[in-house]
Amino acid sequence: MNKVNILLTEANGNLSNSREMIINAIKTAEEYAFPKLKIDWDIDILVTNRIPMIIPENGAGGYTFSADFIRINIDDKKATKNLISENVVHELCHAARWGKNDEWTENLFDGIIFEGLACVLEAEFVKDKSEKTLFIKTILERTDKENEKILSELREQLDSNDYDYDMVFFNGNDKLPRWSGYSLGYYLVKKYLEKTNKKIEDAFADKYTEFKIAL
């Protein structure tokens, strides 16, 4: 049976008391994403509190290195089972895509779609949960009009690989709100799903060029 293999960094002892909660959180994400995305290989997940949080408010964050290796960063004072599960689901979407589609992101458009796919899966996972990360709540509350404005600001850069990643996806500026790349990706992927009559589990491994119909 394919599964996640969980490793916690415990040398400083800060995660020891949360070990059971962390494992349960990851298992919840695994039980949701593995059958939905038809993940048929093992995935190693390293959980650590040794790396500064990119989004401090979330309590948990992640980075997917490959189809079978994910790192989850947590704030052991803020992280809850729900917040960890939500982040793991997001990262499992990245891992699943790489396991079924070996395309690299070659430009800003590809990166936006890559993150948008994971945001859609994450949003579906939390839709009936009262506790959500500030990140996904912000993505879901952003209007179509606001996302169209973001698209207008970024349109000329979509085919370029020379852009400010932190500004587009995280910090924003006077014209782009925080997490613009993620919310635009969510918006475009949702449009793609509507146009193709697909569900996220049918579309997460589609070629990047196919998503151009959402523009």
Which residue stretches match the model-derived regions?
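Pan-zinc metallopeptidase signature
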Residues: 152-215
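N-terminal, Lys/Arg- and Ser/Thr-rich interaction peptides
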Residues: 1-10
